[in-house]
Amino acid sequence: MLTERQLLILQTIIDDFIGSAQPVGSRTLAKKDAITFSSATIRNEMADLEELGFIEKTHSSSGRVPSEKGYRFYVDHLLAPQNLPKDEIVQIKDLFAERIFEAEKIAQQSAQILSELTNYTAIVLGPKLSTNKLKNVQIVSLDRQTAVAIIVTDTGHVQSKTITVPESVDLSDLEKMVNILNEKLSGVPMSELHNKIFKEIVTVLRGYVHNYDSAIKMLDGTFQVPLSEKIYFGGKANMLSQPEFHDIHKVRSLLTMIDNEAEFYDILRHKQVGIQVKIGRENSATAMEDCSLISATYSIGEEQLGTIAILGPTRMQYSRVISLLQLFTRQFTDGLKK
């Protein structure tokens, strides 16, 4: 159990190192307003913290830096919530204030905004479309031979496809077909739509739509959806701006992993509900052993729909990142309920 004095010194060392990226010595600590102990006392406490494994010496400096154990203790016990600037809160809320909530578009923009606000790499795993439910279908006629089929899901995903209208299908038939599809299919999971249309709805259309076989073939492919989630990155090269990663040889494997994307898909799709913080070698990938990954899930009720994550150095602004992720996931979840 650390003493109050040790807790204060450890927190001050980590806060200073996060901000400066420079090893922290006893002289630096002695100049802090919150530290009122003598230099000798500070040195003794630092020696104890080093012996306990919370801080460690670097080869290039007499100062100390946090260890993975130190960061973990800091995140679990010392972290205080950070109030975000009002302009950032407004910027984030404006993103989610769109009249039509398109989850994919929001996910893509979220990754970009988060990377800009943190200067780290942001990763957003979008909702899995196959679990979405159909909200409604629209068919908008462009001319006599061309129309656009628009599908809207319960999460706001909008999918459109240009279709060719056969000469044997008139506009009144299209209108009847849309009404039947909306009546019979609203609330049906996207993964079940294709089979339901071509095995069940066809018999209903037969009684109301002339040349129903031509009409239904016209929609073939419109209701096919990708089975896996889309993954969006923002600031892929941001890690290069961090002092820890100025050595390109050190960061090459990480950049390769980021560029490949598939590994992050596997990491994020199995995330537990809530805020998760993985520090250094707690991450399963060797390329991430000098990084921290903070992730948060967004959901509707009990159904987890996606994950937002920030990848940065272990010297990450943990409090700020967690506050940002909490705001984003809250806004994302509220938007999906619209």
From Swiss-Prot:
GO molecular function: DNA binding
Alphabetical list of Pfam families matching this protein: HrcA
SUPFAM superfamilies, alphabetized: GAF domain-like, Winged helix' DNA-binding domain
This protein's UniProt keywords: Repressor, Stress response, Transcription, Transcription regulation
GO biological process: negative regulation of DNA-templated transcription
Organism domain of life: Bacteria
InterPro entries with a match to the protein in the record: GAF-like_dom_sf, HrcA, HrcA_C, WH-like_DNA-bd_sf, WH_DNA-bd_sf, WHTH_transcript_rep_HrcA_IDD
Role, per record: Negative regulator of class I heat shock genes (grpE-dnaK-dnaJ and groELS operons). Prevents heat-shock induction of these operons.
Family statement: Belongs to the HrcA family.
Protein name in UniProt: Heat-inducible transcription repressor HrcA
Organism field: Bacillus thuringiensis (strain Al Hakam)
